[in-house]
Amino acid sequence: MITVAFSCSKTLTSYGMRCGALILFAQNETDVNDTMTVMEKYARATWSNINNSAMDNFVYVVTDNRDNFLKEKETYIDIMKERSDIFLKEAKDCGLDIYPYKEGFFVTLKIEDQKLAEKVHSAFMDHHIYTVLVNKGIRVAVCSVSVPKVKGLAKKMKDIINCLSE
């Protein structure tokens, strides 16, 4: 059996509404039904039911407002691509080590020494570069940085890391 879970909260920019789904794939319908029953009981016992506004929003977006949603979504995808392309190019140009990145909200700097990562994270904060410390790296939210501010960010980060590494 294969299960695929997704969140509508981020996809439909409905943060906090907690709307999502789990899709089950199996060759045996009985297995799917049994798993669906278990998941339904577990989800209801853990989170109760989603609120009506989340359900209404989902239905509205995928029916009446689908074309507008897809158009708006494409706009944000383009913005994210522009921001990440700038950051990735500048990171490569200055030698800032990052984990492989395909797409998404975050680029993660690769810093395997966790003590150094903690120092770097703190230094970033001192320079008003707000990041999230993660295991063996630092997460940069390119989704929250405007295009003008993302320009030069990788170099600033690399310079800070170099100062701490000396």
PLM features: residue spans?
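Short hydrophobic/aromatic beta-strand micro-patches
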Residues: 23, 108-110, 141-143
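Alpha-helical structural signal in soluble globular domains
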Residues: 60-64, 86, 90-94, 123, ...
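Short, surface-exposed alpha-helical segments at coil->helix boundaries
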Residues: 52-55, 84-85, 118
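PLP-dependent enzyme catalytic core of the Aspartate aminotransferase-like
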Residues: 114-166
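Conserved glycine-rich beta-strand-loop-beta hairpin in the small C-terminal domain of fold type I
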Residues: 59, 72-88, 97-110, 133-136
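Conserved core segment of the aminotransferase class I/II
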Residues: 1-77
